[in-house]
Amino acid sequence: MKAPVLFSILLISFLSICRGENQAKHLFILSGQSNMQGHRPDEAFTPTVGKAFGKDNVIVLQDALGGQPIHRWWKKWRDPQGKKPEESGDLYDRLLSKVKLAIDGQKIASISFVWMQGERDAKMKWGVLYEKALVGLHTQLAEDLNWKVSDLAFVIGRLSDFDLKNKKYPHWSMVREAQVRVAKSTPKFAWVNTDDLNDGKNRKGREIKNDLHYSAEGYQILGQRFAEACIQQI
């Protein structure tokens, strides 16, 4: 093979590699409480967004903790008496530190924030505060990532049909409604239905019906729905 031809092939290969390394990534941030903690991105979410954009072009980061109210993420949250809780924004700081580490040195094409939470706030009767908190959390994340608020996609997992009569969690319906209102407030927001995900066998093999948490299959479907909703926003 002549030297000029060989050089051209090597140059094209090198440029292709460089383009791959410099390709802007699609960032997906997943957070919330137990039903997000039970979700495993590798089962459905990551493969789905990877298929849509290329597995090397996506960054998926999940950080969640069960049983936690939204004020562990949104720092401006105040209780009905106007008091700041002792634990305020600490889980958000943990999440943000992981996000910044994951995107260090990367070019970002889009950011999608996926949120599955609200059970604790419904139980604590903080439903009246939830809509403001959701919007505030989204804005807080956009600002901390230096991203335009209107360009940050927001996908919300609506609370399931676990306690529609509000017996165990007095503000269950209130939080559900707040989630939908926020999701419908701007084109970059969306909500995902979970009403059919809490029947069947859980991850321990126990049969569940209309449970607080989802079945093993339900978590896989949840990941698929989250991914599809994100893809539609990008």
Predicted regions and their residues:
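Mature, extracytoplasmic segments of signal peptide-bearing proteins
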Residues: 16-18
